[in-house]
């Protein structure tokens, strides 16, 4: 439990607040998680196949399987797909709505939430370990110049907390991304993606502090 609440609840509660989501569907192989979501009225039309529920299973085949089965067995054929992964507990309905509105106003065929990379993770700071044991700069640059000032800003997917794409893009490109990818910028704090125990501790600390701030207000 993250601050006495199942991790998935954070995503469900915020998704339910959005006026833009016509239907919320959960893909899982865990009956306990399915029971939790049923209490919220979230649809779990079928359990995810075991072959698509391994720790290293990529998300794209899961979504393609879900869409194919929804169309074949339930005659449900959505045009726009919004993927909200449960490992982003600080992603709120505000983020969801803003991302959807940005996507709908654009001519892009995909959107992904991103956060700015810190100085030490910028590609110009990264070094590659060669087979001979030596380090090599990942990108070349003029060391006579102030690198901090010259570095271009790079962004990375934050989990990603939000993916928006079309069914057409998923099956035509075999990817969540089409030819035009729109960014939705999120802060470092809101971008926390729980992948290990340290991420969990960070998220728990931030949530507890936010609660204290709300109490003060």
Where are these regions (language model features)?
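Conserved core of the sugar-phosphate nucleotidyltransferase
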Residues: 61, 80, 89-180
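Conserved alpha/beta core of the MobA/IspD/sugar-nucleotide pyrophosphorylase nucleotidyltransferase superfamily
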Residues: 154-217
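Active-site-adjacent beta-strand anchor residues
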Residues: 26-27, 113, 163, 193
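N-terminal glycine-rich phosphate-binding loop and ensuing alpha1 helix
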Residues: 1-27
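Short phosphate-binding loop-to-helix
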Residues: 16, 25, 31-82, 91-98
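A structural signal for isolated positions on well-ordered beta-strands in alpha/beta enzyme cores
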Residues: 23-25, 111, 182
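Short, surface-exposed amphipathic charged segments that create phosphate/polyanion-binding patches used
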Residues: 59-64, 125-128, 197-201
């Amino acid at each position: 439990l993250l601050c006495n609440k199942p991790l998935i609840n954070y995503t469900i509660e915020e998704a339910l607040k959005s006026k833009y989501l016509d239907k919320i569907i959960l893909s899982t192989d865990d009956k306990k998680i399915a029971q939790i979501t049923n209490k919220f009225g979230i649809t779990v039309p079928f359990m995810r196949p075991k072959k698509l529920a391994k720790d290293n299973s990529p998300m794209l085949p899961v979504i393609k399987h879900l869409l194919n089965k929804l169309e074949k067995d339930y005659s449900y054929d959505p045009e726009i797909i919004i993927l909200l992964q449960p490992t982003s507990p600080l992603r709120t309905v505000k983020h969801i709505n803003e991302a959807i509105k940005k996507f709908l106003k654009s001519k892009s065929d995909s959107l992904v939430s991103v956060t700015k990379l810190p100085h030490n993770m910028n590609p110009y700071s990264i070094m590659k370990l060669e087979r001979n044991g030596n380090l090599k700069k990942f990108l070349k640059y003029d060391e006579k110049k102030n690198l901090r000032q010259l570095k271009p800003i790079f962004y990375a997917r934050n989990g990603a907390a939000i993916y928006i794409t079309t069914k057409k893009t998923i099956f035509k490109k075999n990817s969540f991304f089409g030819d035009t990818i729109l960014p939705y910028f999120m802060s470092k704090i809101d971008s926390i993606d729980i992948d290990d125990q340290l991420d969990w501790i960070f998220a728990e600390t931030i949530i507890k502090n936010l609660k204290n701030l709300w109490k003060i207000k």
